[in-house]
Structure formats: structure tokens, C-alpha cells
Amino acid sequence: MSGPLASGTCSDPEEVSDLKSPLSSRFREPLTHARFQELFGGAEPEPELPAEPCLPCLCRLRRRRASACSGPGAWRVLLARLPPLRWLPQYRWRAWLLGDAVAGVTVGVVHVPQGMAFALLTSVPPVFGLYTSFFPVLIYSLLGTGRHLSTGTFAVLSLMTGSVVERVVPEPLAGNLSGIEREQLEARRVGAAAAVAFGSGALMLGMFVLQLGVLSTFLSEPVIKALTSGAALHVLVSQLPSLLGLSLPRQIGCFSLFKTLAAVLSALSQSSPAEVTISALSLVLLVPVKELNVRFRDRLLTPIPGEVVMVLLATVLCFTSSLDTRYNVQVVGPLPGGFPQPLLPTLDELPRILADSLPISLVTFAVSTSLASIYADKYSYTIEPNQELLAHGVSNLISSLFSCFPNSATLATTSLLVDAGGNTQLAGLFSCAVVLAALLWLRPFFYYLPKAVLACINISSMRQMFFQMQELPQLWHISHVDFAVWIVTWVAVVTLNVDLGLAVGVVVSMMTVVCRTQRVQCLELGLAEGTELYRPIRESRKLLQVPGLCILSYPAPLYFATRGQFHRILEWHLGLGERIKPGAEPVRVAILDFSGITFVDAAGAREVVQLTRRCQDDGIYLLLAQCNALVLETLTRARLLDSVSPEQLFVSVQDAAAHALERLKPTGPKICTVWV
């Protein structure tokens, strides 16, 4: 092996065979890949599809389709697509029913005020938040695999949808609208929000058909947390006009956060003292209650419903004091009874809305899947990402027919459900029962609810998202790169908007992956005396090296982005180019350890083939060790065996090194052994 003598160079290859062998060692011949296949056999080759369908193939295909349509086949499909058919027979009624009922009612009680609050964030009337807290929850309970997941309105999605609604159906510049004109404007906005839900649901169903559940891995944890934290700041700023009683047009597009702040500061003198007082008192109650629920979650039988208490107090105060007429406090007003008629959303704006539906569908899937995975790991069960795509796709698609806006799982209500003792998706049905009761019998009560209270509920629900910034010091300690991704994504979300911030975060995150693979260092290996282990020589000065033998390990995928780096590193170590490793002896035998190369693309395979030819031209005997089956198959298709013989492909570095040492011996019998 080429390298400095300080690393324990062995002057004579004969000395290597005289090293102290490991205790209880046995000896065998070095195994090439071909010899290993001959002794132990290989995997069964997958049958290739014929170029033209033959009669036996058509018969097999017909039998397969007939089996899928048979009774057992249909039952298997139902079991796969309707999770309740799997978990209901195993449901522990005595142990779980009470917990599911209490948790479902608790979450449902919170859904009512939060749904109305997030509806205002979506720029639609409050009652549509109640619809979005009912239909999607019901559908997910039937199709979802997350036993502890709570779905419904989500502040980040409401903010993103509200921006689309404001762009597609802007507020008229005149400002003063008649009652009929206001109803028409609200109807158009409801239709736009439902169209966004329809588009995002259709996209998720398309991803389900294509089995693209793996896409959730492209939204890394730093990107998701930075996105939600930055969106929480957008929510806070967007609610300032409602907190202060200001009637300001909603800002959309890039720099909307700063535009809103500037508009609020310029109109600060026009604030309503009554609504400022209501907002201050609401926050004084809501924020401490949230903190108490977190700090004493182990001592409380069920979390304190601060939102419900605040809604009751504010509504009674506004009704008894006539705040809406005496001080012009904005209230929710009348809510329509029952449910809306199923109606296909207007698709005229769908081409414009579809581009906005894509990031919404990605955020929906990524947040829901990550939350479901966290609790699945905690409670030892598994979720199915592709089934989650189906559940959220159907949930958004069908609920859009009932004028619902986009929905997903939420961190606040999911943690609330778990803390309250929820065990299965059955808790969602109890939550739906509470929302249904509010829609059927409690509508008149919400007439006098101040909108400022709903704004305070929006802000207080962002508490956990703001506190995600506390994890930054730990993230910096673990990985500087992930810390940089978090900061860049957060700045992009805050400065631009949520959609562009998400795109920036994904691009930066993917670029860091590419950059990490391009900065990989090739490791030169040496033998640990008395063992069969080959370790990087930079880890110890006592590792043995043999003159003329170079063992290299490249611990990264070999593809188009790393091809140049691989080429330069191998040239430098083997002395094939103009830049030669200083103090290195000429290499006679080289071993490439492929155990760290997980995959090779066409460009990488051609680079390996070119390397073997250059080694032949320079008189270097090249051996490849420990290629996985996929890498070896790709190299074979690139005509690697035209440049090397099967006798140069070994199953391990130890086997290749034993063969190389025999080749370096000037005389002696050509018999070599490997310690095992």
C-alpha cells in the first residue's frame, strides 16, 4: 500500500503472512464474486417481461386479474384501504373506549373555537371552519393509519389558502359593500377556498396512484420546523388588525409581513379601545392556561379548555354589555344552520389555483406524516405513507364538496388528544359529535362572539410553533448544515411568503445533500496487526501498509455529481494524473472497497470502466471488493467485464488483499489464505 512509512509500512510482503493471527482463526481461500456464487448460489433472478405478450403470459395476467376481483382478492383490497377493518376487531373496548371518548370530546370542544378562528385566517366566514372540523375528521377516521392523529383546521394551511383566496377574489377598492354584494363576495371566496382543497386533494390522490409516499422524505425536519415557525410569525402579524379593531386590507405576496406591519403602524391611532381591551384580556387568560396545560399535563385529568372558557366569557360579556352596538365591536354574527348542499367547487380558476395547491398538498402530507410517525414510534405501531396520501387526498377532495378549505393534522390538537388519553381513530368520531352538536344547536350562542377573541385563539395556538426556535442551539451542536437549512428556510418564509419559503427550503436542503456527497474524502485503509480488520490509516499510526499495495474506500454514492470528485481522488492516490501524492511509492496493485458506494448511475459506471482501463495502461492491477448486487449489475451493464476479469471481483477487502499479497510476492507458491 502506498503511503508514508509512519503509518506502519511493512517492508516485505512475506512479513504480512507472518503477523500474529487472530485467536481461534481459521483459514480459507480468497473468494472472488464468481467463486462465491458457485459455492453458495445467487438470488433468484426476477423474470423479465417478454417483448410481446405470449399466450401463457396472457393467461397468467387474466388469472391474476380474476383473483383480484374474487372474494378473497376484494377482501384483501378492503383490508388494505379501510384500516378500521383491521383495528376494530382488535379494539379493547373496556380499556380504550373511555379514553377515546374523553379525548374525542376534549378535542372537539377545542375544534369549535379554533375552526371558526382559522376560517377567518382563510378569509371565509367562521361557519366554514366548523364544516372543516367535521367532514375531514370523519373521513380520516375511516381511511387514516395514524391512531393518535387529530386532523382538522391548521393555521399554516389556512394562512396559505387565505393568500390564494385574497389574490383570486380580492376585496373591492371601494370598501363599502351592500349586504348582497358582501354575500356574493363571501360566496366567491368560499368557492375559491373549496377549489384549493379540491386541487390539493386531487394532487394527493394522484401521488397515491403513483405510490409517491416517499416524497415526504424530501421535506426534512429542519425545513418543516422552520416553515411552521415562520408561518406562525405570519399568523401573528396577520391577526394584528383584528386584535386592534382595524379594518385593513390583507396583504399578500412577497414581503406581506412587512407590508402588514407598516399598515398597522400607520393606522395605530385608529385602534378600537374596546377591542384592544378584549384582546388583552383574552391573551392574559389564554397564554397562562396553555402554559399550565403543558407544565401540569401529568397531574391534570384533562387539559383545561382555555379557548372554550374564553369564548363563553367574551360572548356573555358582549351580549350583556351590547359591545357590538355601543362600541362597534366586530362579532361573528349569524351562522347558517345545518350543512351546505354538496356542490362541486367552481373550476374556472382551477388552472390558476392548481399551482398553489401543490405546496399546500406537500405541507399537508409532510406535516401529517411526520406527526403520525412520531406517535407511531412512541406507541410501537406502523403507518403507511401511501395510505396517508389516500386518506388526506380523499379527505380534502370530498370535504371540498361541502365548501371546506384545506385541512391536515395539527400539532396542538394531536398532542391534546394524546394527553387526554386517546388510543385510536375512534376518538375522531367523538370529536365530530361535538362539532355536530355545535352546528345543530349552539349556533345562536356564537352570534355575539367578538372576532378579536378568535384572533387571540389563532395567536395562542401558535405557541408550540414559536417554541420550536428553542431547539436551535441543540441543532447547531448536532449539525451546522441542518442549522443553516433551518435559518435559510425561516428567513425565506418570513421575508417572502410561505410558498416561496417552502420552495427555497427544499432546494437548499437538496443542495446540502449533493454538496455533502461531493465533499466526501476517500479513505486509505491499512491492516490492524493481529486481526483481519482494515481501517482508515488516519485513525491509527499502527496500521500496516505494504509497499506497492493501495487499498481505497469511497464512502459515497457514485453518480453524475460525484463523478469528477471520484476521478480526481483516484488519480491522486494511484498516481495516474499530473498531481501525484507526495512521498508515495509506485502502486502495483490497487483495491477499491465498494462497500460504501450504495448506488452507481450511468456516469459513475462509465467512470469506473475508464479507471480500469487507465490502470491497465499504467500497469496497475486493479481489484474491486464488496460491490453490492445493484452496483455490480450496473457496472456489468456498462461492460466492466470487458476491462477486468471475474477473478478481479472479490466479496470482501480481506479476500482481495490476500490475493494482492500473493501477487506482490516475487517468488513462492501461489497459495494464499484468509483469516476468518
UniProtKB/Swiss-Prot annotation:
The keyword Signal does not apply. It is found in: Membrane. It comes from the Eukaryota. Residues 539-660 form the STAS domain. Gene3D superfamilies: STAS domain (3.30.750.24). Keywords: Antiport, Chloride, Membrane, Transmembrane, Transmembrane helix, Transport. CDD domains: STAS_SulP_like_sulfate_transporter. Coiled coil: none annotated. Belongs to the SLC26A/SulP transporter (TC 2.A.53) family. This is Solute carrier family 26 member 10. It comes from Mus musculus. The lineage of its organism: Eukaryota, Metazoa, Chordata, Craniata, Vertebrata.
